[in-house]
Amino acid sequence: MDVREVLYDCLRSTEQLAEQRKLCITPCFDEKPVLVNCDEVQLRRAFTNILTNALRYAKEEIQIECKADRGKAIVRIHDDGEGIAPELLPHIFDRFFSTRKGGAGIGLSLAKEIVSLHKGTISASNDGGAVFEISLPLRKTT
């Protein structure tokens, strides 16, 4: 499956929320397919959970990168919001952890679980806003 197509599906499904918040989403994807073995529905759910968080906290813009690098598919979702408080970073993937009133705290923990099931990694950091980076093994070509 081409990760770029999964991301485009996520962008289409969150387009209305982005328009309501007057946010610009800038995709920067490799020109060539970024192929991984995956459960497309589950991977879409993981990306959508992360993108929805970015849509909640971004001020004006979200950048989404997708590239192949050293045998990995790298997806980076970067918003221009306040970022994640340093003391919260170690907990954001914990099940039921939420800083939002009424938040269930399931979205990011589910995203991490899905990425892990695909033999990938996910991390969060701050760089002028929150940055989520997902790394998945590329599909081996024969």
Regions of interest found by a model, annotated:
Residues I84-F96:
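Short conserved segment of the HATPase_c
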Residues G107, A111:
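Short alpha-helical Gxxx[C/S/T] motif in the catalytic ATP-binding
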Residues E61-G71:
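Short beta-strand/loop element within the Bergerat-fold HATPase_c
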Residues M1-R12:
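A conserved beta-strand-to-alpha-helix junction within the catalytic ATP-binding
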Residues L35-C38:
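Conserved micro-motifs of the catalytic ATP-binding
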Residues D79:
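Acidic ATP/Mg2+-coordinating residue in the GHKL
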